[in-house]
Amino acid sequence: MDGDRGKRDSYWSTSPSGSTTKPASGWERSSKADTWLLILSFTQWALSIATVIICIIISARQGYSMKEYSMTVEALNMSSREVKESLTSLIRQEVIARAVNIQSSVQTGIPVLLNKNSRDVIQMIDKSCSRQELTQHCESTIAVHHADGIAPLEPHSFWRCPVGEPYLSSDPEISLLPGPSLLSGSTTISGCVRLPSLSIGEAIYAYSSNLITQGCADIGKSYQVLQLGYISLNSDMFPDLNPVVSHTYDINDNRKSCSVVATGTRGYQLCSMPTVDERTDYSSDGIEDLVLDVLDLKGRTKSHRYRNSEVDLDHPFSALYPSVGNGIATEGSLIFLGYGGLTTPLQGDTKCRTQGCQQVSQDTCNEALKITWLGGKQVVSVIIQVNDYLSERPKIRVTTIPITQNYLGAEGRLLKLGDRVYIYTRSSGWHSQLQIGVLDVSHPLTINWTPHEALSRPGNKECNWYNKCPKECISGVYTDAYPLSPDAANVATVTLYANTSRVNPTIMYSNTTNIINMLRIKDVQLEAAYTTTSCITHFGKGYCFHIIEINQKSLNTLQPMLFKTSIPKLCKAES
């Protein structure tokens, strides 16, 4: 052990160079500790100074960064506001555009698509029901009806206002409404399509016209075309006539002077089947055959023909014709207006006017009913009643309208609107002014005529537009009117606005004393003939269909054309 300690002491007392080192004293050790402490203090001070400098530098840099940060935040805020405004504007535009599209779809697109889908379903049902497979056969009727809200215009409901009184306005002027026309026409020239007759029922409408292949003579061989359809709304939200089925009757049957009625899901057509011309017919005893045609929505048709002996006539007639204008349906009966010549004249005093007329008496008016051109026969209007029209063989009864209630018998029509029956007759005699009133079909038959001073029709020189004094004449033209007010004082019509010529067809809305609003179809030289006007409402808004026989000179043909207008009814506020 001692040997090892000697070795260790020898090791620590000898330098690496081989010299011997002496042990350090206590003072020397204290001096070294102070030196190291000084060094540490200086280092700490230096570090503190460096730390302060670094903090100052960092603070300075942080101040600049905060300012830059504030500017950056402000720029970001401005950019955000701009983006927000841009997005808001874009969203607003998109919302408005989509709202307009939605509104357009709701108002127009959806109804059109619904109508199209309805027609597609109807066609599909029709095709499936027309098939016969083994013993199965579909007999159901196609569900066809007017668009929602559409109904024949009923004056009692239409001619009223929530506040104030209704009136016809002259401002703005009426205009033609756009839409298609699907009236039956001709495939040849130099012929005529004549005598349009339109009946608008609660569910469907019926339209009939006569197609003469060559010329326009009444006795010329002709097709009779009967259409059934419904009233829809087009993309402009205006009403249209849309035919569903059409039937063309044999040209060899030669139907003439047809009147129609639409009721339920069927159309009925009453026609004359003359074998001679009109003058020859009036000169002989007995009437030409009548025929009642029935057409349903599946295109099935049935016809009932009646000879003179099969018609229950209240008086002997030499000639009898349906009145061209539409008839009406009541419980168990169809009622048509007719006219014709009595074999033996009735006694009594007819409607007359003597005031302001020279050398005129009641006898003048009575004799004016006997038309020399028609063999001197007394021409009267009649009610043709088809009883039990749903039976296998309906019965026809004819009742003469008393001459005391009427002017010269002529073409015309009946309208059942609400609880009233309105009658129009063509002003064929000396009385040139519009003839429209309310008919009481009870016994005895009576007519309450509404005097109209503003509306008339062209006629021959002796019985022109302005004639008011009684004399024998047969003239005028069929231009019926539709009552807008319950008393038939306010009407819609198409008049040939001329003195003696069948020219210048003009749509007119009028009261008893003034033409309020009118629209000329083209110009005063345009030739035309018969006109018929029928009106409807769509959720209270009134529209009229006007069918006018227009002379197509370039094709040498006469053909009906369809026009539509909106009724210019307004409400006058109470003062």
UniProtKB/Swiss-Prot annotation:
Residues 11-23 have a biased composition (Polar residues). The chain crosses the membrane at residues 38-58. Disulfide bonds join C192-C216, C258-C271, C357-C469, C463-C473, C535-C544. Residues 1-10 have a biased composition (Basic and acidic residues). Attaches the virus to sialic acid-containing cell receptors and thereby initiating infection. Binding of HN protein to the receptor induces a conformational change that allows the F protein to trigger virion/cell membranes fusion. Neuraminidase activity ensures the efficient spread of the virus by dissociating the mature virions from the neuraminic acid containing glycoproteins. Belongs to the paramyxoviruses hemagglutinin-neuraminidase family. This is Hemagglutinin-neuraminidase. It comes from Sendai virus (strain Z) (SeV).
